[in-house]
């Protein structure tokens, strides 16, 4: 009788341990799933920013074509005249729980490219992630030739921070 009780106790302890391990494993899988969902939301947000930048560049190219000096108009549009409006349009992309920022509100010129960095933040179910991506817009292209927008606007250095 005592051996039966001891055997039953050992089996019960092993079962309780297994239940604890299964529960922990399920929690880890759930956290991993939620983390992956947040990651893809952020990547989707960066793609929305990219499409918004393409749209702005396309509109600016059309406006630049009717100006006397298209290249100067194009540069000034992003760097001086509509810089704040451009930043505002990027940061106001509405996606649930997604925050988009132009890093330091800085849009600058470097090596014939207009450059800026974007940070996307998301916090869902106590999981917080951020992604950063850099963008550059070429300024030395032929305005009269139909250049592919994907060659003018380049997204690079996308990484989790």
What would you call each of these model-derived segments?
Residues 2-41:
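Aliphatic-rich helix starts adjacent to a transmembrane/signal segment
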Residues 47-161:
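Conserved functional hotspots that engage anionic ligands or polymers and/or phospholipid headgroups
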